[in-house]
Amino acid sequence: MKQRIYIEGDNLDALKILLGSYRNRIKMIYIDPPYNTGKDFVYHDNRTETELEHLESTNQLNEDGQLLENPKTEGKYHSNWLNMMYPRLYLAKKLLKEDGVLIISIDENEIKNLLEICSEIFGEDNIDTAIWQKVDNDSGKMKITYRMRLEHEYVIFCYKNKNKSFFNKFIEERNYKNEYTNPDNDPRGPWISALISNTEENSNPNSDLYYDITTPSGKVITRQWRVEKWEMDELIKDNRIYFGNKGESAPRLKSFINEPKLSTPATLFSNVGTAKTAGKMIEDIMGDRKVFSYPKPTELLEHLIRIVTDSRFSLNPKKSSKRKVFFPGADMGIDLNDENEIILDFFSGSSTTAHAILKVNNEDNLKRKFIMVQLPEKTDEKSKPYKEGYKNICEIGKERIRRAGDKILEESDNKDLDIGFKVFKIDESNFIPWNPKIKTEKEVEQAILGTANNIVQGRSELDLVYELLLQFGLDLNAEVEEKQVNNHKFYVVNNGFLLICLNPNIDESIAQDILNLKEDLMTEYCRVILLDEALNSVSSINIFNDLNSEDIELDTI
């Protein structure tokens, strides 16, 4: 079953649409937005202007009508870009789960300003910054700035709630054998310990992780811990917490010699691919690295995906082998992350994020889902991508996902890996809206007659079905299947949670068909949607009464 989504269209529109069904549901959002280079800028959010009017009103055209660059001497050099980013980041926060994180790749031009708006939206305490080394030390070509070689870019982490975000740890290669002891004669062997709390002065009394612990000696210690109370109780019960020789010291978490030594992810990403390896990956998958400029390496995205969404398996960036890691509660079967986590990228470009998700899903057998969003920005007619048939960036991104999935399946024995994805395009609603500007009685009469069928011509039944899913708060991965019952075709959503019949002509017999279908599906709750034009006033009342008596809700469109 296809559990992944690709959306073509403006990402601001996409975020607004997704909000109804995906609010508080996204675990990780990664974006690599267009950097503010002063060149042509394709994201304009004032929908009252045409593209030409916008360029003219913002003084982006010269006397000959040619596009100007966005020079730093222009007062709006930074504000134009930041005004584009702000509403998108604001909506992105609403989509994140409580333990979710937004990750942004950015260069030196806007790091300072971007950090300011991220702090305003997410809160200053919910921001971290890392550095990605984007070139090898021996790389021949690199940007020179201020007499120095520019070898890095920035990665910003914006947490919805930093106290609830959990980052997976990575295995260190050091030999720690000399540091292990066994002062309490634990039968599991020698161990070392680590703090499992903030210091008393750095604890937040308002945090959900702020609670009391009573030591074996009876001493009460109150501070902000790094695990929830129920998990701490389980760790104490399992003798994984050490309170010192006298049983009165601050708790420390024990890690045994036969368990890997773990390290928190560092702020320097130096072994997770470079711009050069990213280009090589594009070449391997698409046949030519010139198909897409400035992609991020899949290794970087794989690293980010693992530390955010996987509590059980992590990859040491220096190695290629999969390794099992320990986290507090692992021995008790505590799963801190959902194997079906959703990852969103709303500047998806060549679909590096989707490619990376397919790779890590194949390696650890989890079922992460993705939502890719990309504006169908046209490729230059003189460019190689255009000549090879890629008329816009979306065509490149979709083809990369297909080829990457096929390559992964070909090279692995994981025949259960789901590599399929659904494609949606943002457009005007499938339903004709009422025009509020009509005033005269004749205009009202014509409007009523003209909207007896209020569905836009040329739209398919599935177009209507998926818009209705979003209107009713269901996501785009909802199960949809067709079922024919006598003369009526139904779209059955999520095993009968929603039944949609778009037949233009129906009679009162549909009520019994619905009752029979509900019984066959063995569903308790059921909501039915019918076309308003398919009903007359009498049949509508009778059908409503028949269904209402069986606790089935009826809506018409």
Regions found by a protein language model. Name each.
Residues 1-91, 246, 261-267, 271-272, ...:
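SAM-dependent nucleic-acid methyltransferase catalytic core
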Residues 141-149, 386-388, 436-443, 544:
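Short, surface-exposed amphipathic charged segments that create phosphate/polyanion-binding patches used
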Residues 1-342, 364, 375-380:
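Class I S-adenosyl-L-methionine
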Residues 51-72, 372-431:
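Conserved phosphoryl-transfer catalytic core
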Residues 76-80, 285-293, 342-345, 362, ...:
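Short, contiguous acidic/charged loop-to-helix segments that flank catalytic cores in large enzymes
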Residues 360-366:
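Post-Walker A helix-loop "phosphate-sensing" segment adjacent to the P-loop in P-loop NTPases
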Residues 137-144, 377-390, 446-454:
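Short beta-alpha connecting loops at secondary-structure transitions
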Residues 31, 339-360, 469:
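A phosphate-binding catalytic loop at a beta-strand-loop-alpha-helix junction
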